[in-house]
Structure formats: structure tokens, C-alpha cells
A protein has these predicted regions:
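Hydrophobic alpha-helical transmembrane segments of polytopic membrane proteins
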Residues: 209-223
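Predominantly long cytosolic amphipathic alpha-helical stalk/bundle segments
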Residues: 68-174, 186-198, 225-258
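Short, strongly hydrophobic alpha-helical membrane anchors
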Residues: 1-35, 196
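Transmembrane alpha-helix/interfacial motif
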Residues: 39-81
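Helix-loop-helix
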Residues: 177-211
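Hydrophobic single transmembrane helices highlighted by the model
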Residues: 25-52, 210-214
Length: 258
């Protein structure tokens, strides 16, 4: 009889909403954000804006680098066309120049364009007779400067907006930490005003504070990963630009200004 009594009592406690098994309502993260203090809301808004801007930059930069790599590979195929042999003539450079104009997203094509234009200028200014050695060296230096300047411009263009990713990756966690510290401080102020240190009083403020840290990390982690990836891809393209500039300058030296 006692066993039946205790079984019925346990069943009644579980089924009753106000019984011992009933807990307090779960904390809703969205409601915590809405109920956050103005300072924490500003922190969260700044972090969200930083995260959104980073994702736009990541998408645009990814498309830019993929297109640059693909079109640069096509340009190298055109430039080193084996069907043309090893002979370099003005007609061959003109043909490469004509095809390179359609590869507008290729850094290599734009570097070639700069070198081609400078070569045309120095050869057009030369006399019909064979130029003296100092003049040849000056012309080579002029073409080399044009190639170097164009390569630097391409690297600068590829690195555009990457500082935003680097800044977000390094600053966003600290901005989130500031929001966390502010939220925890408000929680302790609330405890002092109420004179009650129960979990129901402390938990909302702590949860609100930790949300700021979570948003900061969510903004920083993708930014750092994308920045490192893009820097690696840009360094590969930069080495390709340097190698092509050296090869093109050797061709100019041997076949046009030798």
C-alpha cells in the first residue's frame, strides 16, 4: 500500500506544472540581445557590421583571385605558345598583345601590357642605326622599371581591402570582450542593488555578456582564416609576376634590344 501511495505521489508531482520538477523558463538568446544594455547593443551592432562587411570582402576577393588565376594561366598559354617556336618577333608580340587585351582580369596580362607599351616607346624613339651600348642599357632599364611598377600595382590591387579582414580578426575579439566585461559589471551592479545573488538574477546578465564575446569570435575567426588564405594566394601570384617580368625582360634583351 505504501508503495502505491509513493508512486501516485511522484506521478502527481511530475504532472503538476508547479511541482518540484518544473523549472524556470529557458533563456532566449534573441530576447537577451533585445534586453541588453545600450552599450552592449552598440557593441553587438558594431561586431555584426564588421562581420557582414568581412563576408562581402571575402566573397569579392575570392572571385577576384579565382578569376585572376584562371586568366593568368590562359595568358601564359598564349604567351608561351609552342606552335610559335622559340623565335620572338615584333609580329609575335603584337599577336600576344592583341589576345591579352581580352584577359582584363589577368595581372600577368596587364604587366605584359606595360612592358609592351614601354618597349614600343623605346624602340620607336631609337635611331635606324644600331644604338650605342649605354642607350641599350638605358632602354632595358626603362622596360624593367615599367614591368616592376606594373607588378607592384597589381599586388597592391590584389591586396586591396585585406587590411579590413586583418583589423577585424585582431580587434573583434577585444570589442566582444569589452561587451562581456560591461555586461558582467552590470550583473554585479544588479546583484548589489537587489541584495540577491541567486542564479535567476545573475544568469541573464552573464549570458548577455557572453553573447557579445561569441559574436566577436564569430566575426574574427572567418576573417583571420580568409586573410591568411588570400595572402597565400597573392604571394603565389606575386612570384608568378616576378618570374614573368624576368622572362619578358630576357626576351627583350636578346631579341629586341640586344
Amino acid at each position: 500500500m505504501d508503495d502505491v501511495f509513493y508512486a501516485n505521489l511522484v506521478t502527481l508531482q511530475v504532472a503538476t506544472p508547479g511541482g518540484a520538477g518544473a523549472g524556470h523558463g529557458q533563456l532566449d538568446p534573441w530576447q537577451l540581445v533585445l534586453d541588453a544594455s545600450p552599450v552592449v547593443k552598440i557593441v553587438m551592432l558594431v561586431l555584426v557590421l564588421m562581420s557582414v562587411s568581412c563576408w562581402f570582402i571575402i566573397g569579392g576577393k575570392l572571385v577576384q583571385l579565382l578569376r585572376a588565376s584562371a586568366q593568368s594561366a590562359r595568358f601564359l598559354h598564349v604567351f608561351w605558345d609552342k606552335a610559335q617556336g622559340s623565335a620572338w618577333t615584333t609580329e609575335r608580340l603584337e599577336a600576344v598583345y592583341g589576345k591579352a587585351r581580352s584577359l582584363e582580369s589577368s595581372p600577368l596580362a596587364r604587366v605584359f601590357h606595360a612592358g609592351y607599351v614601354e618597349l614600343a616607346r623605346v624602340t620607336g624613339d631609337a635611331d635606324a642605326t644600331q644604338p650605342a651600348q649605354p642607350e641599350v642599357q638605358a632602354d632595358l632599364d626603362s622596360v624593367a622599371r615599367a614591368l616592376h611598377r606594373a607588378a607592384n600595382n597589381e599586388v597592391t590591387l590584389l591586396e586591396n581591402l585585406l587590411p579590413v579582414l586583418a583589423t577585424t580578426g585582431s580587434v573583434a575579439p577585444f570589442i566582444g570582450l569589452f561587451g562581456t566585461v560591461w555586461g558582467v559589471m552590470n550583473s554585479f551592479i544588479g546583484i548589489g542593488n537587489l541584495g540577491n545573488a541567486s542564479l535567476a538574477v545573475v544568469a541573464p546578465g552573464i549570458a548577455e555578456a557572453l553573447i557579445a564575446t561569441a559574436i566577436g569570435l564569430a566575426a574574427a575567426i572567418p576573417a583571420v582564416m580568409a586573410y591568411n588564405y588570400f595572402i597565400r594566394r597573392i604571394r603565389v601570384l606575386e612570384s608568378e609576376l616576378d618570374a614573368f617580368a624576368s622572362d619578358y625582360l630576357n626576351i627583350v634583351r636578346r631579341h629586341f634590344l640586344g
